[in-house]
Amino acid sequence: MLTKRIIPCLDIKNGKVVKGINFVGLREIGDPVELAKIYEEQCADEIVFLDITASFEEREIIGELIGRAARELSIPLTVGGGIRSIDDFRRILARGADKVSVNSAAIENPELIRQAANEFGVQCVVVAIDAKKRADHRGYDVYIKGGRENAGLDLVDWAKKCERLGAGEILLTSMDKDGTKTGYDLEMLNDVCTAVNIPVVASGGCGKISDIVEVFQNTRSDAALFASLFHYGEATVDEVKDELIKNNIPARIIKKETL
C-alpha cells in the first residue's frame, strides 16, 4: 500500500505566509522558506506554496521566492497562484518547482491542462479546486478567483474532466471548512475520490491530528494538506506521522539517530 502524504500548505501574500478563516481575515505568519525548512526537518512529504491573491489581483508569483525554496528544500515543491499560461508553467518549473498547481486559468481555458501535461508530463500538473456545498445541499459548486467567484461548474463533473485532460493530481479544498478547524469535508472528498482515478489531496478544515487520521480512514484521499495546525505550533509533522502509524495508516518516517 502506498504511504499517505503529509503536506504543509503555505498560503502566501506579498511574500509572507498568511492564514485566515473561509479565505478572509488573513493574518501574517512568517517567511515561507524558513517555515518550509522546518517542516522538511519534521518529515513532511511535500510542500505547497500558494499565492492566494495572485489570480485575483493578476500579479505574478515572485520567482525569487520559488528559486530560494527550491534550492533549500530536498522534498517536492508545488507552486500555484496566478498561473495563466503554458509559459507560467515553464517559468515556475525552470525555477525549480516540481509541480505546478493551476486553478482559475484551468477553468477559463481547460486545454491548458492538456497542453501542460503533454509538454511537462502529468506528474507536474496539479489542478486545485475550491468547492462549496450548494444551498440545497445537493452537490458542490466550484469557485475561482481565490474563492470569490462561482464558476458555475459541478465539482464532480469538473474533477472528472480534469482527469480526462491530463491532470496528474487534484488538490481539493472545502471552502466551507477552510480555516475552521472542524475536520475535513469527508462527503465532498468521497464524492471526488470515487469519481476519479488520480490522486486526491484533501484540504480545508484540519484542526487536530485526529482529523488527519479520520480523513485517511474514511476516504480514499492520497494526501492531507493543512496549514493552521502547523503554523501555530499546535502539532508537528512528526507527531502526525506517529499517530498515523499507530492507527495502521502507512506513512513515510525517518529514523533519527540517537547519540
From Swiss-Prot:
Reactions catalysed according to its record: 5-[(5-phospho-1-deoxy-D-ribulos-1-ylimino)methylamino]-1-(5-phospho-beta-D-ribosyl)imidazole-4-carboxamide + L-glutamine = D-erythro-1-(imidazol-4-yl)glycerol 3-phosphate + 5-amino-1-(5-phospho-beta-D-ribosyl)imidazole-4-carboxamide + L-glutamate + H(+)
Subcellular location: Cytoplasm
Transmembrane region(s): none
EC number: 4.3.2.10
Record's protein name: Imidazole glycerol phosphate synthase subunit HisF
Pfam families reported for this sequence: His_biosynth
Keyword entries, A-Z: Amino-acid biosynthesis, Cytoplasm, Histidine biosynthesis, Lyase
NCBIfam families: hisF (TIGR00735)
InterPro entries: Aldolase_TIM (IPR013785), His_biosynth (IPR006062), HisF (IPR004651), IGPS_HisA/HisF (IPR050064), RibuloseP-bd_barrel (IPR011060)
Superkingdom classification of source: Bacteria
Pathway assigned to this chain's UniProt record: Amino-acid biosynthesis; L-histidine biosynthesis; L-histidine from 5-phospho-alpha-D-ribose 1-diphosphate: step 5/9
Gene coding for it: hisF
One example GO MF annotation: lyase activity
GO biological process assignments: L-histidine biosynthetic process
Chief location: cytoplasm
Entry similarity comment: Belongs to the HisA/HisF family.
Phenotype for residue 25 to S: In strain: IL1403
Effect of residue 226 to V: In strain: IL1403
CDD domains: HisF
GO cellular component, one term: cytoplasm
Active-site residues (renumbered): 11, 130
